[in-house]
UniProtKB/Swiss-Prot annotation:
GO terms for biological process: histidyl-tRNA aminoacylation. This is Histidine--tRNA ligase. Coiled coil: none annotated. It catalyses: tRNA(His) + L-histidine + ATP = L-histidyl-tRNA(His) + AMP + diphosphate + H(+). InterPro entries: aa-tRNA-synth_II (IPR006195), aa-tRNA-synth_II/BPL/LPL (IPR045864), Anticodon-bd (IPR004154), Anticodon-bd_dom_sf (IPR036621), His-tRNA-ligase (IPR015807), HisRS-like_core (IPR041715), HisRS/HisZ (IPR004516), HisRS_anticodon (IPR033656). The keyword Kinase does not apply. Keywords: Aminoacyl-tRNA synthetase, ATP-binding, Cytoplasm, Ligase, Nucleotide-binding, Protein biosynthesis. It is an enzyme of class 6 (ligase). It comes from the Bacteria. It comes from Geobacillus sp. (strain WCH70).
Amino acid sequence: MAFQIPRGTQDILPGEVEKWQYVEKIARDICKRYNYHEIRTPIFEHTELFLRGVGDTTDIVQKEMYTFEDRAGRSMTLRPEGTAPVVRSFVENKMYGNPNQPIKLYYIGPMFRYERPQAGRFRQFVQFGVEAIGSNDPAIDAEVIAMAMELYRSLGLKKLRLVINSLGDVETRKAHRQALIDHFKSRIHELCEDCQVRLEKNPLRILDCKKDRDHELMATAPSILDYLNDESRHYFEKVKAYLTKLGIPFEVDPRLVRGLDYYHHTTFEIMSDAEGFGAITTLCGGGRYSGLVQEIGGPETPGIGFALSIERLLAALEAEGITLPISEGIDCYVVAVGEKAKDESILLVHKLRKAGIVADKDYQDRKIKAQLKSADRLNAKFVAILGDDELAKEVINIKEMSTGEQTEVPLHSVVDYLKERLS
């Protein structure tokens, strides 16, 4: 039987994985500059965590989670997103007691959602996200948004659009919720079944419906911005002022929502406007939450974060025709001719590697011509040719592949010679 990977997953092969490594390195470097620290949580958690932390009325919980019972009969779920596990760890490890608030965390790892595979969407995907937990300052909202924008800009993406909104506070959402119910209830039968359920459970999520987004009721729905109280309006104005101060352009879209009750104030998405990117234009989404920490068992603690898919980021780079500066090839390929030279080549390659030189050699006992072809295929910068005669004289021939220039070097100084030539 020939096995194939499960639908909605992918193998990331050599030659492609270097792009992932490059993007992840840039993300880690940015996090370090912003003083965010990596956190690693399990890829599966108790299902109840996501029922509470993601919301039992969301599509993720109702339709997309990979849930199973372990051998003790406990319900477990492969993590569909990163915020709930990070907040669970924040509470469980009592990070709220750390005097250096906010706690700034980031994560990179696989997430799992059972959804229809399509361009930019997989059932296993890699998510990069950050969480800043413990501050109510609108400046941290601007900082988090700036981090996401810096990642995309540093990779060369230009066709980006930042969309922001405010969900206000508890008072705002309560008033807006009633206005939405009044607006939709007389014609709710015109909308999809999901929206009909959402009307009573979570009417704000009707605005996020993909099926009915073009329905006239959506265009005329009450704007949450009209229900902001003075405090919420002031908070939103501060966030916008900080973004302007940082030189980050944005659009305000009152239909940009987060359906969970603990999301308050700032919410944002970063879109790609690149031609050929596909129907799914959202690259990154985030927002401020007040209540999630309490929901998961901790004290009242605010937070803000974002998450993005590495797969979708790479697709955006491709759509804009951006080639990442991936270094290909090796520094030195050791060609050995003769039994003694072959034995010595193992030690030589080991010395080169210990000195930080990327090196390889032949392991197929091939002729010199075939070994040189291997060096060429591996894009070796230099080839070190060692034969039994050279070994007897304690010398080695170094060939620079780009010029064909060949130099005889004392065997004891080959490491220093190559380090100097490669610097």
